[in-house]
């Protein structure tokens, strides 16, 4: 079962005629977490329900956990732990849940030098925004300048590997113009995840679309067969 909580989401999956894509993506992440070391620490879980409202059946929904900082959800340092005096202390002691989404619909947000949007999902202040922005931009600068080892010291690579594997297996094209791509900073490290929003632009049915647009998946699987590169540890 799922941990007790008062906040839940009813996903309509209205863009997905199979109603299954979100559940499949979350299921793949569960397999990774249960069989591999490291990786994404938490992703939403849920179950399908038939919703009846005022005696009227209104359809099939996916009842699942909401993405939020919480001991029974994403368990990272919560700026609101001190209810009477929140957001006190140095910015680096807080956990930051972020979403890369070109909808820019949060109050606290920033963009990297390469135009990747990051939206803070919780209320913040100017010092917290400055810290999160500096941390993420610092990693991006290191990667683009070829200082990979230094950048990797600030990243949980296993979570990024698992996150990207799920995106590739689901053939999610929305990473190109990011929608609902979550990440977070906690205790001086940046993590990928949790997963969200796979009911649109995933597992395309067009043969031409899949063959022409996902050559990386083919090369990734070839790496697995040859036991070369980073993929060998995940075979």
Spans of model-derived segments:
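ATP-dependent phospho-/nucleotidyl transfer catalytic cores
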Residues: 13, 63, 69-170, 220
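A generic secondary-structure signal for well-formed alpha-helical elements
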Residues: 28-37, 53, 66-71, 75, ...
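C-terminal catalytic region of ATP-dependent kinase domains
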Residues: 124-126, 133, 187-235
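Active-site acidic catalytic loop and adjacent metal/ATP-binding pocket
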Residues: 154-205
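A conserved hydrophobic secondary-structure block that centers on an alpha-helix together
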Residues: 2-60, 138-159
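Solvent-exposed loop/turn segments at secondary-structure junctions
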Residues: 15-18, 56-58, 66-70, 103-105, ...
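Active-site-proximal structural scaffolding
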Residues: 3, 18-22, 42-44, 125, ...
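Extracellular structured ligand-interaction cores
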Residues: 5-7, 44-48, 57-61, 93-97, ...
């Amino acid at each position: 079962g799922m941990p007790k909580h008062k906040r839940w989401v009813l996903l309509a999956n209205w863009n997905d005629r199979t109603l299954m894509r979100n559940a499949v993506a979350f299921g793949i992440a569960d397999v990774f977490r249960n069989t591999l070391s490291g990786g994404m620490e938490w992703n939403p879980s849920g179950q399908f329900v038939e919703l009846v409202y005022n005696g009227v059946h209104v359809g099939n929904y996916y009842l699942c956990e909401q993405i939020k900082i919480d001991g029974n959800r994403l368990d990272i340092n919560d700026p609101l732990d001190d209810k009477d005096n929140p957001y006190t202390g140095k910015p680096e002691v807080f956990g930051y849940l972020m979403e890369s989404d070109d909808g820019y619909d949060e109050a606290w947000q920033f963009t990297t030098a390469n135009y990747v949007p990051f939206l803070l999902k919780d209320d913040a202040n100017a010092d917290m925004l400055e810290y999160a922005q500096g941390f993420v931009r610092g990693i991006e600068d290191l990667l683009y300048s070829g200082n990979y080892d230094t950048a990797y010291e600030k990243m949980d690579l296993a979570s990024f590997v698992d996150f990207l594997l799920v995106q590739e297996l689901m053939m999610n094209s929305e990473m190109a113009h990011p929608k609902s791509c979550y990440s977070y900073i906690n205790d001086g490290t940046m993590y990928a995840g949790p997963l969200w929003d796979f009911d649109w632009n995933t597992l395309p049915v067009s043969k031409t679309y899949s063959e022409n647009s996902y050559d990386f998946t083919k090369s990734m699987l070839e790496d697995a067969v040859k036991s070369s590169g980073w993929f060998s540890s995940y075979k």
